[in-house]
Amino acid sequence: MQTSISTTTIEDHLHHYSPEESQKLLSRESSINTDLFKHENESVDLLLKEMNSTPSKLLPIDKHSHLQLQPQSSSASIFNSPTKPLNFPRTNSKPSLDPNSSSDTYTSEQDQEKGKEEKKDTAFQTSFDRNFDLDNSIDIQQTIQHQQQQPQQQQQLPQTDNNLIDEFSFQTPMTSTLDLTKQNPTVDKINENHAPTYINTSPNKSIMKKATPKASPKKVAFTATNPEIHHYPDNRVEEEDQSQQKEDSVEPPSIQHQWKDPSQFNYSDEDTNASVPPTPPLHTTKPTFAQLLNKNNEVNSEPEALTDMKLKHENFSNLSLDEKVNLYLSPTNNNNSKNVSDMDSHLQNLQDASKNKTNENIHNLSFALKAPKNDIENPLNSLTNADISLRSSGSSQSSLQSLRDDNRVLESTPGSPKKVNPGLSLNDGIKGFSDEVVESLLPRDLSRDKLETTKENDAPEHNNENFIDAKSTNTNKGQLLVSSDDHLDSFDRSYNHTEQSILNLLNSASQSQISLNALEKQKQIQEQEQTQAAEPEEETSFSDNIKVKQEPKSNLEFVKVTIKKEPVSATEIKAPKREFSSRILRIKNEDEIAEPADIHPKKENEANSHVEDTDALLKKALNDDEESDTTQNSTKMSIRFHIDSDWKLEDSNDGDREDNDDISRFEKSDILNDVSQTSDIIGDKYGNSSSEITTKTLAPPRSDNNDKENSKSFEDPANNESSQQQLEVPHTKEDDSILANSSNIAPPEELTLPVVEANDYSSFNDVTKTFDAYSSFEESLSREHETDSKPINFISIWHKQEKQKKHQIHKVPTKQIIASYQQYKNEQESRVTSDKVKIPNAIQSKKFKEVNVMSRRVVSPDMDDLNVSQFLPELSEDSGFKDLNFANYSNNTNRPRSFTPLSTKNVLSNIDNDPNVVEPPEPKSYAEIRNARRLSANKAAPNQAPPLPPQRQPSSTRSNSNKRVSRFRVPTFEIRRTSSALAPCDMYNDIFDDFGAGSKPTIKAEGMKTLPSMDKDDVKRILNAKKGVTQDEYINAKLVDQKPKKNSIVTDPEDRYEELQQTASIHNATIDSSIYGRPDSISTDMLPYLSDELKKPPTALLSADRLFMEQEVHPLRSNSVLVHPGAGAATNSSMLPEPDFELINSPTRNVSNNSDNVAISGNASTISFNQLDMNFDDQATIGQKIQEQPASKSANTVRGDDDGLASAPETPRTPTKKESISSKPAKLSSASPRKSPIKIGSPVRVIKKNGSIAGIEPIPKATHKPKKSFQGNEISNHKVRDGGISPSSGSEHQQHNPSMVSVPSQYTDATSTVPDENKDVQHKPREKQKQKHHHRHHHHKQKTDIPGVVDDEIPDVGLQERGKLFFRVLGIKNINLPDINTHKGRFTLTLDNGVHCVTTPEYNMDDHNVAIGKEFELTVADSLEFILTLKASYEKPRGTLVEVTEKKVVKSRNRLSRLFGSKDIITTTKFVPTEVKDTWANKFAPDGSFARCYIDLQQFEDQITGKALQFDLNCFNEWETMSNGNQPMKRGKPYKIAQLEVKMLYVPRSDPREILPTSIRSAYESINELNNEQNNYFEGYLHQEGGDCPIFKKRFFKLMGTSLLAHSEISHKTRAKINLSKVVDLIYVDKENIDRSNHRNFSDVLLLDHAFKIKFANGELIDFCAPNKHEMKIWIQNLQEIIYRNRFRRQPWVNLMLQQQQQQQSSQQ
């Protein structure tokens, strides 16, 4: 759509001007003195006028001053004109050139006649016809031949054409200038009459010919010798106006301008090669809405033919709006199968045009871009009015063409010394569009300084190159992708780039208007002049062009400037071979730039419009070859065609740069490695040739290949001897045409590549990192005496890959190219950075919808390929995406920032069709890709494949075409957030390391949320203050074996203890460290009150002293701990091991008195320990159960050594038994070889050390040898069932194995039996337990030391927790705050243990005593310290309002009253607040803290273990401040401000699976339930089998508490005592339906009627049979209650609390 619109717009604009005016625009001499870029406004005006002018008006322009046109006549052609219609064909069909003509860049002496003939041709044909007249290479070749033959006949300059037609066949990019109007014989005639009108800016065969005409080269239009050609008066606007008014070409007076003296510009030959017209607005060629409407209103005889020509290529984008509207709306056209999308795009263009109002934007932008220079010559006018005829090859035309091509082409030439066009720029670009594309859309404005310099020199190249580099990467990408006709749009887009100056467009338009013959003549002249200039320029590869500029300072400089600018674009544009074509284009661009400088804005617009028409015609002819690319590449490609006849003309824009790149890279896959060398050598050769052609060598060759080839082809005209020299000679011509240099600038990209070795991924990546970096690299390359790498346009690369031959790569002098290229890079960097804009989707939504613009690095839709390969330093022939028609932008290392090609028509289709193309989301992020690239720089492409194998392979097609396979691979680097260390999911876990990741809260409180500690440092103060308790005392209390222990719950798992002990803040165990080694240091200095408080022994409150009374024995509640076991019973999971230190006898009974009870209890304890051993052998359960106790606690904890297990439960921390219980178990256990549950013997004993239980060990068998005889108080049950252990005196401990399995049985109904194979494990677990206890005493440091101990089975809580402290704050009392009632204070209480903190709700502090009643559950590690902080908020007292009355005496207002001395009294009443002193102002911390209490569990542990006691805790105010006089506020000493009345209960944990109570209330409720159980009583007759009865025997049984006493049936003597607390299950028939009568009973066991079984923890069974069902139900109910409680009563803490109750009761008695 853009193309069609642009062509139609150009045509419409061309129609606005009369032929004379357009001729004036074309014939205007480009004043050397004027700087084309000083006034971009005028150039824009010229462009607008040109766009508004009719083609007929532009055509006659060629008639004027043929001499001037001849050098510039080639630039007058659409190819040469800086402004080309967007529809201008990228690929110019190969123009048929007269074999005698040296090249398209040279114009014969008859260029004037050719210009006239071309005028005639244009008169006969519209611009659209010219654009689309020649759709195939044959037509183009014919037109080219006509154009070339005519100028050759007229000029009669010997030119060697090596198979012109063949060279310009569509196999090569159509960069040769074409007289598209010559399609008809009338066209040929016109071309004869107007040779200069249409010169194929793309390098003709003559240009590409290695042999140049032997005749001396004509003068270069832009050489300094022809200053009159480029007259740029200071008042450029006025002169432009005058030039616009002039119908005949008039030479404006020469005015000193930057073009006049190329030396004053530090441009390398590339810069000189790219004539730099002021950067046109991005959419200069795009018609405005008004133009589109006018165009629709205009009646054109051409549209149909032009439409047909365009449709021949099925390129609807080339159609104008009218054509498309007619095509879609007309009945005939409606029948045609056309893409509605084209119409939509056309409508979209209309809409965009209406919105954007391109004309106004162009004018405004042009004025904004306008340099201080007043007048800007229309380069078209300068061309038409050029007094100096271009020499044989018409290099100036080629330069104009190159300029035009550069305008069209994305500035791909890295070496072109273009300056940044600081126009409109999107810093971030437009999403979905490459920066280059956006630049093309946005008019870019060179800084006026840069405009003046870069307009002439850098703007064409720099704009073109940057445009080409940045844009041609996109355009060239698109063009490379489209590579031929389909990429016309991208080529047009390339013209739309902001980087292309309007003057570039104008120059390209003027060049395109110049006939091919004129171009050839001019190229020949330029070749000659360049050869002359090249001789001095040979010194430096690009300095050749510079020298050429210097020699023809006026023209050459101008030409060089233009050449430099356009060569950038042209070089970047040309896909086949940028070097030559770009150089030719550069020459043409210079000519064009010279003209644009001369052209007034109007004439420039006319010339541009005419040029656009010619461009449209050229595009028509060159559609297949890349219309727009061909235009700029037409000159470049003509050069390249001279160089490589075999090359297919491809997008001249892309080819200009990319051809150079492609030629350099694709012709040589090794060029990537050799790019720097090749480009440098090429630049050198080119510089040499340009030095030979010094006169015309304005633009140093930019593309190493193209420039080399071009230089060689030009050297052939100058010197037929060496093809390289021939190429260089035309290349020097192309130096005049900066496009060649721009292509040379493109070689600097290749230089970048050469700099980066193919395998040197890192350096290559650095080169390719950013386009700016690329520019900087280009700048570095562009330094004058540095070799310039071959410019690599992705399009040119792609074209080279597909169409160019590697052997065609020619080395070009790189020094000058580098110098110009460096400037270009500098300018380009600034420009590229500014130019990085993206075309909005509205502009080319359809075409780019599929294009993957992942980043600026994305050169082609196969982004991953580029990214993965990271712009392979080596360009392979197939590195370009052939199937996708993508230039291998990844190969363009110079362009780290890939840009999607502007024309993605083919790209989209190919992307859709190509499965290898990966969608943009698929490619990794560019950061990842870059990293992957960097990582994989030296790795093979197969490795790249993992990231994007499909795309890699399309890109690897380059490896297929390329003999070189990219050695870069992007590793499949994929961050998996679930597993990768880089994943942020666990990023913040370290924040919670202090209280353990995922650990349970160490503080719990109902209705309160547990948060991380906020006062950890304050909690440390307790530890510090405890040092006041003498170091030895503290160590003895807290450590075993003098080894540091964890000091608080704030400890991490023991596994990490060794790591954390030195770093743990709260629980720092390094007590003997230097800090803690001074016990008095902290207590005496820092917190003496705290030290004293911690040293003070706590005193439990008596009931009389309790202010907040609560019931000690709480009523039974459903939340009793007993309920929890009941719930757990159904779960069949052993939360707690049955083996526990427990009192088997009921707490109400005296265990010592009852031998049965003693025996049973002993057996129970034994079983419990066996269970512990079996179930927790690796866990040291006993050690866990029996936590290390301070030495002070040891006395209370253990009472007996023999039955340590029994005694352990009596310790404050673990349930212990009395000595009386432990004395008999040995006897009882030895009595029963079977170890029935009724017989209990303790198989282990507790090992004490330093007052703490260090572990347990099996009791010698002699002491615990079971007794086989019944002693009366024991029942020897020989009948063990369900896995019972056979009686064996020698395996007593082994007989306890069932208890090991009984842990689950305690909680489940499943029988818990232990096979005999477990017997061997018994002793070993005990040893492990022993070790583990000892290990725990050493803070588990020995855990690693003892491999046998495996703690993995023990929950971490077992390692960290040794009990629970229930801390209930009953209330605060004795609050020492004044005026509590008036302040209406509210306070909260925060408990902080250094790990977590919990804050209570607010309480009203309206009295000195406030009830709180909140209970906290704190996890106790080896030690526990915590603080309670009270924080208050209150209302500051408000002062009362006091009424104040004020009286004032005022003179009376009445005069009479005043006379009498009367006065008025005014009374004023005010309410003044009285200040109230806030008595709380200095008593609170900023956060409201006013009281703090420090608690150390060690102080209270002995007293509160197993029983709850109340205490008064002093709270201190540490925040009160006071001031003495004027001194600042100072914090006073802490003082007691309140007291907390608290109740504390410490419940030690004996087993990690032990279920502890949840509160003080639940603990006592559970104990009360057990106590009430002792009151249960039932009796009756039962038959017993099992235990001591081998057969069923009737007995009388009494159920008392948990004891079932068996009595003789008759005498009722006690025969046995069965400890029901050991029963784990009750088995009877039909438990579920016991209360139902109508049911059938099914059971797995044999049971008698009314029978039931009780199962013990060791698996032993005893059968009972009731006399009747009723009694059976009563027995079952009672037994079930007991069994239900058994799961709870086995808890060691229950036994402990029961024991404490007993002691308390006994003490009270």
From Swiss-Prot:
GO terms for cellular component: cell surface; cellular bud neck; cellular bud neck contractile ring; septin ring. GO terms for biological process: axial cellular bud site selection; biological process involved in interaction with host; biological process involved in symbiotic interaction; cell adhesion; cell-substrate adhesion; filamentous growth; filamentous growth of a population of unicellular organisms; nuclear division. GO terms for molecular function: cell adhesion molecule binding; GTP binding. Residues 10-27, 111-122, 448-464, 595-623, 641-655, 662-671, 704-715 have a biased composition (Basic and acidic residues). Its main location: other. CDD domains: PH_Bud4 (cd13278). Keywords: Cell adhesion, Cell cycle, Cell division. This is Bud site selection protein BUD4. The lineage of its organism: Eukaryota, Fungi, Dikarya, Ascomycota, Saccharomycotina.
